């Protein structure tokens, strides 16, 4: 690696660039940017004399072995920084705007949209509907393709930014227009053709709505999506989430046990067929289907490397397997402790069974597991990630909580100790009069939290 730095000369490249100055929020320790003296508050003006329009441009331009950065310091002084580095080595720069541009909001009015089912009075950011392909690349968000221009598609292909996660929901163009309440939603499916032709890796999802895109429509969607293999690596099928706030919205019904069995029969039949032909299982059912149907979770190899974890596909199988491995490797009798843990109704039977095994291994440790009903959104919402502080307080106050209460990390806003209803961790500790530990979502972390490691 080689770095050189100099003040920017008057006769060198200059641009009218107000729109494309990107304020730097932070610099990673030990990074190239830190060694060069780049600091929070500096502005990135250009890379190799190219304006940086957004994060797509940035990731494409920094993937080079020789770079020339133009940086403007807070006092207006401009630095030209010449860098020699490994091709894909990151500079270690974090920007105030993660996308280096404005976020794109959703243009659809989906019949199943969860945000439309939220009560009034929550923090403003929770009501923002994103449908931005850049967030798909950066954070794994799913996009409907209705908000993507031909230029966006070409940039993804040319920059080879992948994977792109797509909310298909159905491959029936007319039905897709109706489900998304967007007359362009069917035509937008053709953009997946261009991504496939460009060799871009994709993942897909289908939010299943009873009597709408299930049954024969689901069969059609799976069949037609297989044409994108191998670029389309996986497709999840998850049941629509229904809250109690659906007044004035499309009258969707919750799935029942027999419905779940039929959905899983379809998925399993297609898995066998696709595996024989392509060597992958491709189509995956969300964990909720197996709980609702009363069926055993698939074995690990059926998940093809857990490509759909963020969609709730395979989370319980992974948790069980990680717990078993950590349990078999765990040593010692464990010190005397009295603990509690709260979780959603979906994971409760599995957490309860793990706690039972730990009590057998560590007899001096008492663990109380409490399932939390979602009174805030409604009892059809069973995942722990949508549990609020108010529900925890209402259902745990007066219970035996022991010296520590364990809560899964997905109950909290990313990177913060705040629940969806803005109750903070200290406020919950005060209300319940107990110290709370946040536990990561792995079997190993659960055992370590119980042992107090």
What are these regions (language model features)?
Residues 1-17, 23, 294-453:
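Radical SAM enzyme core and accessory elements
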Residues 9, 59-95:
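PDZ-domain C-terminal substructure recognizer with occasional recognition of PDZ-binding tails
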Residues 20-29, 49-52:
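Short, structured beta-strand/loop micro-motifs enriched in basic residues and often containing a Trp
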Residues 33, 41-44, 69, 113:
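Terminal peptide-recognition signature
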Residues 76-78, 85-231, 241-270:
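Conserved Radical SAM active-site core
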């Amino acid at each position: 690696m080689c770095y050189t730095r100099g003040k920017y000369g008057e006769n060198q490249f200059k641009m009218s660039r107000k729109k494309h100055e990107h304020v730097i929020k932070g610099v990673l320790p030990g990074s190239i940017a830190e060694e060069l003296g780049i600091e929070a508050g500096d502005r990135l003006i250009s890379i190799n004399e190219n304006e940086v329009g957004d994060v797509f441009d940035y990731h494409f331009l920094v993937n080079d072995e020789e770079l020339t950065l133009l940086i403007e310091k807070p006092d207006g002084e401009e630095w030209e920084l010449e860098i020699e580095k490994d091709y894909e080595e990151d500079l270690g720069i974090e920007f105030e705007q993660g996308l280096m541009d404005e976020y794109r909001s959703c243009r659809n009015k989906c019949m199943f949209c969860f945000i439309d089912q939220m009560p009034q009075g929550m923090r403003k950011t929770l009501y923002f509907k994103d449908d931005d392909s850049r967030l798909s690349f950066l954070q794994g968000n799913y996009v409907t393709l209705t908000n993507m221009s031909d230029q966006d598609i070409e940039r993804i292909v040319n920059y080879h930014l992948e994977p792109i996660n797509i909310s298909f929901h159905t491959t029936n163009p007319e039905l897709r227009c109706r489900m998304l309440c967007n007359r362009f939603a069917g035509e937008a499916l053709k953009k997946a053709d261009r991504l496939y032709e460009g060799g871009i890796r994709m993942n897909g999802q289908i939010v299943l709505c009873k009597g709408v895109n299930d049954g024969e429509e689901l069969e059609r969607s799976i069949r037609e999506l297989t044409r994108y293999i191998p670029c389309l690596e996986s497709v999840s099928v998850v049941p629509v989430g229904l809250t109690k706030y659906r007044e004035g919205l499309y009258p969707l019904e919750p799935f029942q046990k027999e419905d779940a069995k039929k959905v899983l029969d379809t998925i399993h039949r297609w898995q066998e067929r696709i595996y024989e032909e392509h060597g992958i299982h491709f189509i995956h059912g969300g964990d909720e289907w197996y709980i609702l149907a009363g069926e055993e979770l698939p074995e690990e190899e059926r998940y093809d490397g857990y490509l759909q974890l963020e969609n709730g596909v395979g989370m319980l199988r992974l948790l069980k397997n990680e717990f078993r491995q950590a349990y078999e490797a765990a040593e010692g009798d464990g010190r005397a402790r009295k603990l509690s843990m709260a979780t959603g109704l979906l994971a409760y039977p599995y957490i309860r069974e793990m706690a039972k095994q730990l009590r057998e291994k560590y007899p001096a440790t008492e663990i109380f597991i409490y399932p939390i009903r979602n009174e805030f959104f409604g009892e059809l919402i069973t995942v722990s990630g949508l549990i609020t502080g108010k529900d925890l307080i209402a259902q745990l106050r007066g219970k035996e909580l022991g010296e520590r209460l364990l809560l899964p990390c997905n109950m909290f806003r990313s990177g913060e100790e705040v629940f969806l209803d803005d109750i903070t961790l200290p406020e919950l500790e005060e209300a319940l009069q107990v110290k709370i530990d946040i536990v990561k979502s792995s079997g190993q972390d659960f055992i370590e939290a119980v042992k107090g490691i």
